[in-house]
Amino acid sequence: MTETVIEARGLSKSYGDFHALRPSTFSVPLGRILGVIGANGAGKTTMLNAVLGLSSFEGELSVMGCDPSTERGKLMQDVCFIADVATLPKWMKVGEVLDYVEGVHPRFDRAKAMEFLNRTNVPLDRKVRALSKGMTVQLHLAVVMSIDAKLLVLDEPTLGLDIIFRKQFYAALLEEYFDENRTVIVTTHQVEEIEHILSDVMFIKDGEIVLEAEMDALTQQFIEVMVTPGMEEEAQKLGPISKGVTFGKTTCIYKNIDREKLAELGETRRLGLADIFVATMTGEG
């Protein structure tokens, strides 16, 4: 039986009449990479703060067998939380950053970080503010890769970086860090760049989980049809969740409709994660 890393039942967070996170029930198994995707203010960070024991919450929540609200000290022995690269202390030298992380995280392996940095051109005596974007990413990776955590939580980790450096970050995360004994949670709104590394996905809108699925199943559920002229009425009868016009033709997106039936309406194609996200957030169903 697969070990469960996070188990939430009715997890919610409100500020007066404002529901930052509506009652949510979900679980995250060991050895998965979960993408938590939503617009700014959707509730992603609120959920993470509850998981990390950084804020109070309503409902039930267990993270690696611990209650984050009462056992945060024990929990953080096995958890690493990294926000975007802009959070690296710019006034510190690279070597001082390693000193700092070594002092605050019990599972940080300085020797491993040095081994990683020695393969780069990042100078230990240079202040973070003087590093190029590429060097900043390398330092960020050195910190992430060198913390032996069972749960790695990344909140918009590549915010503000150019696409080349964003891709470099995620490639290294997948190739050099992740294995079946670790679980990774990534929040982002840059959907296309993490699609290839995810095993599971969760969409959040206005504090509510509107979709939760394994990636393999998700890409089977959603199909787009470029409707053959004259078949628009039949296409509407099947209940598309989203409609549009492409090259003068009606396009419809369907969820959980047999592909053979849809093929009778026109040309079909499977959707990427970004298209599924947009259809789910803006669609009719």
Task: Give the positions of each predicted feature.
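Conserved structural motif at the start of ABC-family nucleotide-binding domains
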Residues: 6, 21-23, 76
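The feature captures the beta-strand-to-loop junction immediately N-terminal to the Walker
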Residues: 34-39
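Helix-to-loop junction immediately C-terminal to a conserved catalytic motif
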Residues: 52
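Conserved ABC transporter NBD signature motif
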Residues: 59-70, 74-75
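ABC-family P-loop ATPase nucleotide-binding domains
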Residues: 83-139
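Catalytic Walker B motif of ABC-type/P-loop ATPase nucleotide-binding domains
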Residues: 152-156, 161
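ABC transporter nucleotide-binding domain
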Residues: 168-254
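C-terminal coupling/interaction segments
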Residues: 242-285
